[in-house]
């Protein structure tokens, strides 16, 4: 959880970068891409840890990871949809980085931090509840 929180603080700080600077400066783009990738990957890692710990159905794709949590009632369906979209974006960042739509990346930077913050809150609550029920529990 600590890794996610640190990455989200970076993401939040980078939201203050002016759009013009982001679109024109490759170093700024790389910095933002890295923070976004770490944030999304951290959320995926937390989700897969919960899936493994609770012996839930194994997802076939990163996008499906959050659907598994929603199917078990751990996160809301709407949050799972938004997180699945970010997982798809993560795949683009990793595999198609040379052909990114920078305006779309900037829009995600500005608007999707709340999705990951909500996930963090929900997962902290879930882990806390699980730890109460099973003191030998998570992370």
Question: What is the predicted role of each segment?
Answer:
Residues 1-139:
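Solvent-exposed interaction patches of small proteins and small membrane subunits
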């Amino acid at each position: 959880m600590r890794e996610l929180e640190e990455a989200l603080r970076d993401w939040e700080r980078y939201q203050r970068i002016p759009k013009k600077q982001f679109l024109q400066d490759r170093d700024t783009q790389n910095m933002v891409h890295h923070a976004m990738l770490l944030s999304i990957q951290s959320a995926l890692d937390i989700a897969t840890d919960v899936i493994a710990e609770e012996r839930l159905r194994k997802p076939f794709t990163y996008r499906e990871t959050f659907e598994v949590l929603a199917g078990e009632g751990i996160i809301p369906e709407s949050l799972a949809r938004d997180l699945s979209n970010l997982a798809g974006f993560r795949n683009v960042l990793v595999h198609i980085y040379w052909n990114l739509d920078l305006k779309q990346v900037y829009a995600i930077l500005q608007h999707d931090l709340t999705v990951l913050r909500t996930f963090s809150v929900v997962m902290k609550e879930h882990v806390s509840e699980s730890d109460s029920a099973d003191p030998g529990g998570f992370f």
